């Protein structure tokens, strides 16, 4: 696989070519994903739940994300690697710059930040300092205590309108990718069409430019339960490499996510 950059993702959006993304936390799986030509890998704070066994992502630290980013980069030199900014690691622009710098030095190509238009100034400051940003909207797991649990976002008209506004504001501030989690498919399609930057979805229907899954869900090895928006590709194929290839094919062909993986 050739080295992937944000320019490739922009080109694919313009061409209408969908792309697959998956979380990765270590060199071995990162290497497997690169060999199967997964273009984008996310070192997610989901590691707090799937690796550390916590009930949410809040305890994860910047140092832990940096460690796993180094591991993923070692295994996958050519993928575009996004690294999550953990809870409270970007409470101020100064904190954001310091912690984003650690993740970029660990091998990330981009950092991911959760939040709406209130993080626009932070996004702008990072972009001005050569740190590409993916802005995460919808169900933002770091806000689980505000939401009262892991709930679908953007179902009422006012919240849907605010999410569209958030996406456009963050794009204008310099965000180079928008990630939508657990939002109605119709809203995700609207945001995807409104934004000029690539939009990645998880539990957001199949109209987004890209899809992302937590690797443990894709392989059916999550400790607790399988989210509605996920699919066990390993059960279907019986082989990890074939499972990754099937996931990529289904995303590119627009057959995943199907109706049963989608919220309305």
UniProtKB/Swiss-Prot annotation:
Q: Give this protein's Gene Ontology molecular function annotations.
A: 3-methyl-2-oxobutanoate hydroxymethyltransferase activity; magnesium ion binding
Gene Ontology BP terms? pantothenate biosynthetic process
Could you confirm whether the keyword Magnesium appears in this record?
A: yes
Cofactor binding note from Swiss-Prot or TrEMBL: Binds 1 Mg(2+) ion per subunit.
Q: Which Gene3D superfamilies match?
A: Phosphoenolpyruvate-binding domains
Swiss-Prot/TrEMBL catalytic activity: 3-methyl-2-oxobutanoate + (6R)-5,10-methylene-5,6,7,8-tetrahydrofolate + H2O = 2-dehydropantoate + (6S)-5,6,7,8-tetrahydrofolate
Task: Tell me which EC number(s) this protein carries.
Answer: 2.1.2.11
Keyword set includes Chaperone: no
Q: Name one Pfam family in it.
A: Pantoate_transf
Positions annotated as active site in the UniProt record: 181 (proton acceptor)
Indicate where this protein resides in the cell.
Cytoplasm
Signal peptide segment: none
Locate the residues binding Mg(2+): 45, 84, 114
Q: In which pathway does it act?
A: Cofactor biosynthesis; (R)-pantothenate biosynthesis; (R)-pantoate from 3-methyl-2-oxobutanoate: step 1/2
Task: Please provide, in alphabetical order, the Gene Ontology terms of the cellular component aspect for this entry.
Answer: cytoplasm
Cite the NCBIfam families for this sequence.
panB, PRK00311.1
> Whom does it interact with, and what assembly results?
Homodecamer; pentamer of dimers.
Function recorded in the entry: Catalyzes the reversible reaction in which hydroxymethyl group from 5,10-methylenetetrahydrofolate is transferred onto alpha-ketoisovalerate to form ketopantoate.
Q: Which family does it belong to?
A: Belongs to the PanB family.
Spell out the protein name for this chain: 3-methyl-2-oxobutanoate hydroxymethyltransferase
Q: Which organism is it from?
A: Aliivibrio fischeri (strain MJ11)
Q: What is the lineage of its organism?
A: Bacteria, Pseudomonadati, Pseudomonadota, Gammaproteobacteria, Vibrionales
């Amino acid at each position: 696989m050739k080295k992937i950059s944000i320019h490739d993702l922009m080109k694919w959006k313009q061409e209408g070519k969908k792309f697959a993304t998956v979380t990765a936390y270590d060199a071995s799986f990162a290497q497997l994903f690169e060999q199967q030509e997964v273009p984008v890998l996310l070192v997610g704070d989901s590691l707090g739940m799937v690796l550390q066994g916590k009930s949410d992502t809040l305890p994860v630290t910047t140092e832990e994300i940096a460690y796993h980013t180094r591991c993923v980069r070692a295994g996958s030199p050519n993928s575009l690697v996004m690294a999550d900014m953990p809870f409270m690691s970007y409470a101020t622009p100064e904190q954001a710059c310091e912690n984003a710098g650690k993740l970029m030095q660990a091998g990330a190509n981009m950092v991911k930040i959760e939040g709406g238009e209130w993080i626009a100034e932070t996004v702008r400051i990072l972009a001005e300092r050569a740190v590409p940003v993916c802005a995460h909207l919808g169900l933002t797991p770091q806000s689980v205590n505000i939401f009262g649990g892991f709930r679908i976002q953007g179902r009422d008209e006012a919240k849907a309108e605010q999410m569209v506004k958030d996406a456009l504001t963050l794009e204008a501030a310099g965000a180079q990718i928008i990630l939508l989690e657990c939002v109605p498919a119709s809203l995700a399609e609207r945001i995807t069409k409104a934004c000029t930057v690539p939009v990645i979805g998880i539990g957001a229907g199949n109209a987004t430019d890209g899809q992302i899954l937590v690797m443990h869900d894709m392989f059916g090895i999550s400790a607790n339960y399988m989210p509605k928006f996920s699919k066990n590709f390993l059960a279907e194929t019986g082989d990890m490499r074939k499972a990754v290839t099937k996931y990529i094919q289904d995303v590119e062909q627009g057959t995943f996510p199907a109706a049963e993986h989608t919220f309305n």
